[in-house]
Amino acid sequence: MKHAIRHIHFVGLGGAGMSGIAEVLFNLGYRISGSDLVDSATLRRLQGLGIGTCLGHAGAHIEGADAVVTSTAVTADNPEVLAARAKKIPVVPRALMLAELMRLKQGIAIAGTHGKTTTTSLVTSVLAEAGLDPTFVIGGRLNSVGAHAKLGSGDYIVVEADESDASFLNLLPVMAVVTNIDADHMETYGHDFGRLKGAFVDFLHRMPFYGTAILCVDSPAVRDIMPGVTCPITSYGLSEDAQVRAVDLRADGARMHFTVQRSNGVTLPDLAVQLNLAGAHNVLNALSAIAVAVELNIPDAAVLRALAGFKGVGRRFQSYGQLPAKDGGQFSVIDDYGHHPVEMAATLAAARGAFPGRRLVLAFQPHRYSRTRDCFEDFVRVMGSADAVLLTEVYAAGEAPVVAADGRSLARALRVAGRVEPVFVADVADLPQAIAENARDGDLLLCMGAGSIGAVPGKLLEMLRNDEHTAMQRTAP
């Protein structure tokens, strides 16, 4: 070809979705380079693979590139985008590049407001356990592989489908899961919930006539759209009319036990499932993977092994173990990406079920002023269900501040509600010290948020273990 694409440059390479696509393309034989504003473990890992990376954005970084891929966060006035436009180098949105990848395989796309990353990981793990060696691109690090993505030799590619900017409408899967639909990223849809639901219908209709929609009927909004979906549907959930249904749920520490009943056309034997994840919300995520397995005729034994041995996803109820408390005891630390009230409520319930009787301490960094404004009362209600709360300022994610939708306003409203007395920590950099001062023996600390709070558990661990080491040195004879 006259304009063959050999060198692809990624602007915003450190993002979870971007890094995954870049890694798969690199393994397909393309030359990959990329830039990001800040250094990260993701960038360093890609460097180790042989991918060229740059810190900061400059027009010179795209030298030699045949195409430039951008994330949603990259603006039109980015110097690398401007340089590409000036040189007539194609500028490709991330979702379009993901769609190109999906053309090489049979695509299974996981959509929904919550649970996409965990569900994508579970589906990937089930296919891998069955020997299907899928390609995958996930928004989190799959712990069993240690990466966000992998190029497999099999026929399937499993991807997250992002509704936040409506970019999932670029994808052409042969099977699609919708985990739930809630009001989030409403600015994309003109603050019209009907438009959001309509976008999910349009997404499902991107499948070919032989495609299958795997839909969670426990979500009222998903149930609402079902009459308008013209492709074949397999429903799942805890509801009595679900075709793939879980009953007899039981928590066992950070694991869930349940029985699956399957009656999609043909009634299959019940499955006694052990899931290596906590919470009823993760039972729903596992049910979607089981429904996919039914469609692909994956043996039950492979499904059961995959779910029982699932090693989790980075920042999804991720345990950091026990850390020393100021009073001489120990407290447990769990890190979670959840940042919407629905996600937070599910994770808090999972924590209560997995660790009954423990004092639950929530450390939360709100994500985006617009979400804080739109979900303000729900945030106050959910945070009030914890036993203690440490709250930081909002992680802006590029947004301008919104009056009365900041961290201090949330803390004030939480205090007025009277359920809990919050500790407000303006700078997230001071959060590890604030946690150390407030944690007690036996506490369960849950760090939640999609912003820079993700670095807090690691910094807390380093700080407390260094303090412990120093104390031991002082008391040594």
UniProtKB/Swiss-Prot annotation:
GO terms for cellular component: cytoplasm. Pfam families: Mur_ligase, Mur_ligase_C, Mur_ligase_M. PANTHER family: UDP-N-ACETYLMURAMATE--L-ALANINE LIGASE, UDP-N-ACETYLMURAMATE--L-ALANINE LIGASE-RELATED. Pathway: Cell wall biogenesis; peptidoglycan biosynthesis. ATP binds at residues 112-118. Its EC number is 6.3.2.8. GO terms for biological process: cell division; cell wall organization; peptidoglycan biosynthetic process; regulation of cell shape. It comes from the Bacteria. This is UDP-N-acetylmuramate--L-alanine ligase. Cell wall formation. Its main location: cytoplasm. It comes from Verminephrobacter eiseniae (strain EF01-2). The gene is murC. Gene3D superfamilies: Mur ligase, C-terminal domain, Mur-like, catalytic domain, NAD(P)-binding Rossmann-like Domain. It is found in: Cytoplasm. One of its GO terms (molecular function) is UDP-N-acetylmuramate-L-alanine ligase activity.
